[in-house]
Regions:
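Bacterial N-terminal signal peptides
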Residues: 9-22
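N-terminal (or domain-start) structured segment
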Residues: 27-116, 179-206, 297-300, 322-327
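An extracytoplasmic/periplasmic, membrane-proximal ligand-sensing/linker region
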Residues: 34-36, 242, 267-327
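Hinge/capping helix and adjacent helix->loop/strand transition within the periplasmic-binding protein
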Residues: 84-93, 107-194, 243, 248, ...
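Extracytoplasmic/secreted proteins, especially bacterial periplasmic and envelope-associated proteins
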Residues: 51, 55, 59, 63, ...
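Ligand-binding pocket segment of bilobal, Venus flytrap-like solute-binding proteins
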Residues: 160-162, 166-240
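Positively charged n-region of N-terminal signal peptides that target proteins for export
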Residues: 1-5
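Short secondary-structure boundary segments
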Residues: 99-100, 135, 211-212, 230, ...
Length: 327
């Protein structure tokens, strides 16, 4: 009888402890945030990604009632910052502001984790990518590139930053239009600036730019935008057809979102998503994103954002099959 009573008491105590812990976690989630939030941006200061996250976060902190402190943590192909957040306490006070590079880094063999190592909070913006030629090139639109390659096998030069967004862009583009990668020359550059210089010098045939990197050159006629990798035409390039209008079934963008460490309570994720969603309703914020940074506001949270990430990673994985990351 004493043993039975002891077992019962132990069980009750254990259940009470579990209940107490659950109540404590719920209380913590309901009290969130209890301190300033650290937003790790795994890139250097001053770039479009850094500025966009800072801009939106300054507005989001009004809703949260605490400061969101951006921390630039560049290095190791943006994996230094992502790993730091991945290994942080899942209490909502350390976040990651990043984009497709999370999946790209795993596909390139740089790390062993991808989107599934985090809790997705919200997609915020997309910067639409644009295949581009110099103004003197005979190709007038993206649907002419495949024929041009077939007419000049092994001679056509496409620029890219190895293992980066544009590397995957061209792999996916070649797959969609039926270009064999053995028939083209992929020329690697360390950054976008050097690709701009190479296209200005006509050392390459094609590059992948967007409005932040190529807008001024599109406007003055130095570069020719060959299509827009987005379901709809861009306000900044109303006369440039989408790739889908040209018969190329692909969209491609740099999709920026906010992530939390795995295990962060849903209530906290919802609170953060709501704050960032409210920030994107501000007309000044939206105007700067669209007009200064050539990006589009696209807000997705919860299951919708998870579905977007799943589709994004599947498309990148398919493109990765055509990439030799060792060369």
């Amino acid at each position: 009888m004493m043993r039975t009573t002891l077992c019962l008491a132990t069980t009750v105590a254990a259940l009470s402890l579990v209940s107490s812990l659950n109540l404590t976690n719920t209380a913590r989630a309901n009290d969130f945030p209890t301190q300033d939030i650290r937003l790790v941006i795994p890139y250097g200061p001053g770039g479009a990604t850094d500025i966009i996250f800072r801009l939106i976060s300054q507005e989001a902190e009004r809703d949260l009632g605490v400061s969101i402190v951006p921390v630039n943590m560049a290095g190791a192909g943006a994996t230094l910052g992502s790993r730091n957040v991945k290994d942080s306490r899942p209490d909502g006070h350390t976040l990651l502001g990043s984009h497709d590079t999370i999946a790209l880094s795993k596909l390139a063999g740089m790390v062993d984790y991808s989107y599934d190592a985090f809790e997705p909070i919200a997609l915020l913006t997309q910067t639409i990518n644009i295949p581009t030629a110099h103004a003197n090139h005979e190709v007038q639109s993206a649907d002419q590139i495949a024929d041009y390659v077939r007419e000049n096998p092994g001679q056509v030069r496409f620029s890219m930053i190895p293992s980066s967004t544009d590397h995957f862009f061209w792999a996916q583009f070649f797959q969609e239009v039926g270009i064999d990668m053995a028939d083209v020359r992929l020329v690697g550059y360390p950054d976008t600036g050097e690709q701009v210089s190479a296209l200005l010098a006509e050392e390459i045939d094609f590059a992948m730019f967007n409005l932040p990197s190529g807008g001024a050159f599109f406007e003055d006629g130095t570069f020719r935008p060959l299509g827009v990798a987005h379901p709809e035409r861009l306000d900044g390039l109303p006369d440039v057809a989408t790739l889908r209008e040209l018969g190329i079934d692909m969209d491609h963008s740099t999709s920026r979102g906010i992530f939390a460490p795995k295990g962060t309570p849903q209530e906290i994720l919802d609170t953060l998503a709501e704050a960032y969603g409210q920030a994107l309703e501000d007309e000044t914020v939206r105007s700067r994103i669209e007009n200064e940074f050539g990006s589009v506001v696209r807000f997705l949270a919860g299951e919708d954002y998870q579905a977007f990430l799943d589709e994004n990673e599947a498309a990148l994985s398919a493109a990765a099959e055509n990439i030799d990351f060792q060369n």
